[in-house]
Amino acid sequence: MGARASVLSGGKLDTWERIRLRPGGKKKYALKHLIWASRELERFTLNPGLLETSEGCKQIIGQLQPSIQTGSEEIRSLYNTVATLYCVHERIEVKDTKEAVEKMEEEQNKSKKKTQQAAADSSQVSQNYPIVQNLQGQMVHQAISPRTLNAWVKVIEEKAFSPEVIPMFSALSEGATPQDLNTMLNTVGGHQAAMQMLKETINDEAAEWDRLHPVHAGPVAPGQMREPRGSDIAGTTSTLQEQIAWMTSNPPIPVGEIYKRWIILGLNKIVRMYSPVSILDIRQGPKEPFRDYVDRFYKTLRAEQASQDVKNWMTETLLVQNANPDCKTILKALGPQATLEEMMTACQGVGGPGHKARVLAEAMSQVTGSATAVMMQRGNFKGPRKSIKCFNCGKEGHTAKNCRAPRKKGCWKCGREGHQMKDCTERQANFLGKIWPSHKGRPGNFLQSRPEPTAPPAESFGFGEEITPSQKQEQKDKELYPLASLKSLFGNDPSSQ
C-alpha cells in the first residue's frame, strides 16, 4: 500500500486532496483513489509506475481512450482518475474531475494540431509501429517480437477465450499489419474449433467488403496502387510490401486496422460461445461480497453481444435487481443516481464476518421470540412463579418446614388448639354449602349409606330332574359369561364336547 500511495507527495498530494469528485460535490480525492487506480492498472496488465509522471499518465490515457465509449464504468472511472492525476503533475489548476478531463482533452487537441502541422511541413507519412522509417528514409516493416507472441500464447493458454482476451489482443496488435495478425493467429495451437469459427467470420466480412467496394473497371493507371480486396486485407492475396504501401499511402488505407476489426468481431463470437452464462443469470449469493459479485457481473457483461446503450441499461437495472436482499436494500436507499464507487463503499461490510454475526444474532432472536410465543399459545408457558408463604409466621420466601420463628401452637388456620389444620372446620364447606368434618363419615354430597340390592331369587324350571355337578358348573358359567360358548353362534361347539 505504501508503494502505491507514494505516487504523490508534498504539495502535489495537497492539491490532489483539494479536487472534488463531482462539480459542487462534497467528496474529494484521497489516497485510496490512487491505490484503487494502481490495482486497476495491474488488472488491465498496465504498469502502475506510469502514474508517477505526467508522461506515464499520457500513455495510460492513450490506452484507455479508445475503450471509453464501449468500456465499463470502471474504465471510465479509471480514465477520469488518471486525467485528474495528469493535471496535478502538470500543475494545471482544476476544481473537479469534469474540469480536469476538459483540460486534458484541450492539451491533447493542441498536441494533435502540432503533430499534424509538423507532418504537413515535412511532408512525411505516419511512422506507427511496426512500420518505421530507416536511416535512408524508407518505410520498412519491423517484425512482431517473440516476446509479444509469447505473451499472446500465454493469455490464450491461461484464459482460453474469456472476455479479457479481446482487450489483450487489441493491445498486443497495435499498428500491426495483416501479416503480423496472421502470425499471432497461427501461434494458437489448440482451440482449433474456435479458430475455424474465426476463419468463417473473416471470410464473411471479406465478402461483405467486396460487395461494398467493387473493383473499378479497366486497368490500373501507372504509378497508382490497386484497391485492396477482402482477401488482400486478410493477408492471403497481398504481399507485405503491398500492405505497407496501403498503410503508408496518402491518404492511407488502414488494412491492418480493418483486418483487426474483423478478428475482434470473430473473437466476440468465440467469447460468447466459451462463456455461455447470460448476464441475466448473474446473481449475488447470500454470503458473497458485493465486490466479487460486481466483478462477475462486468466480466459477463463484456461477453454480451449488445450495443453500449443496452449494456448501460443492463448495468443500471440488473446490477441492483440481482443483488442479494441485504445489498439490494442498501442500493435502493442510495437511489438510482449512485455511482459504482458509492455502491461498493455502502455494501463493503455485507457478507463479511461482522455482518454474518449480526444477521445470525437477529435470526436467533427471532427464533427465540417465536418459540416463546408458541409456548405461551400452547399453555406451556407458566409465567412467573407465585411466591411461597409460610404458614407458621405468615412471611413470604420460605415454607413452615424451614421457618426459624417459634412454632405456632394449635391450628395454623384458625389459631385454636385441640386440632390440626387438616381437621379444621372453619370455612371447610363443600359446594352444597355444608360443613364436612373428616370425623363424621362421608361428605354430604355422597350417599351416606349403601343399600344392598334386593333382586328376586332365581326361578327353577327343572321339574324335579336331577342336575349333575358338571351341569351346575355349565349353567353357572352361562349366567356369568353368556357369550363364552360358541353354541349361540355356530350351533354345537365341538370344543365343549
Swiss-Prot record:
Q: Which stretches does the record call CCHC-type zinc fingers? A: 388-405, 409-426
Q: Where is this region: Dimerization/Multimerization of capsid protein p24?
A: 274-360
Q: Where is this region: Interaction with Gp41?
A: 7-31
Give the compositionally biased regions (Low complexity): 116-125
Regions that span the bilayer = none
- Residue numbers of motif PTAP/PSAP motif? 453-456
| InterPro entries hit by this protein | Gag_p24_C (IPR045345), Gag_p6 (IPR014817), Lentvrl_matrix_N (IPR000071), Matrix_HIV/RSV_N (IPR012344), Primate_lentivir_Gag_pol-like (IPR050195), Retrov_capsid_C (IPR008916), Retrov_capsid_N (IPR008919), Retrovr_matrix (IPR010999)
Q: Which PROSITE patterns does the record cross-reference, listed alphabetically?
A: ZF_CCHC (PS50158)
Query: Which UniProt keywords are given for this protein, alphabetically ordered?
Result: AIDS, Capsid protein, Host cell membrane, Host cytoplasm, Host endosome, Host membrane, Host nucleus, Host-virus interaction, Lipoprotein, Membrane, Metal-binding, Methylation, Myristate, Phosphoprotein, Repeat, RNA-binding, Viral budding, Viral budding via the host ESCRT complexes, Viral nucleoprotein, Viral release from host cell, Virion, Zinc, Zinc-finger
Name the Gene3D superfamilies for this protein: 1.10.1200.30, 6.10.250.390, Human Immunodeficiency Virus Type 1 Capsid Protein, Immunodeficiency lentiviruses, gag gene matrix protein p17, Single helix bin, Zinc finger, CCHC-type
Which residues does the annotated region (Interaction with host AP3D1) include? 12-19
Region annotation (Interaction with membrane phosphatidylinositol 4,5-bisphosphate) maps to 73-77
Tell me which GO cellular component terms the UniProt record holds.
host cell nucleus; host cell plasma membrane; host multivesicular body; membrane; viral nucleocapsid; virion membrane
* Residues bearing PTM Phosphoserine: 145
Where do we find the motif LYPX(n)L motif here? Answer: 480-489
Q: Where is this region: Interaction with host CALM1?
A: 8-43
Give the site residues for Cleavage.
129-130, 360-361, 375-376, 430-431, 446-447
Sequence similarity: Belongs to the primate lentivirus group gag polyprotein family.
Q: Return the protein name.
A: Gag polyprotein
Q: Which organism is it from?
A: Human immunodeficiency virus type 1 group M subtype D (isolate NDK)
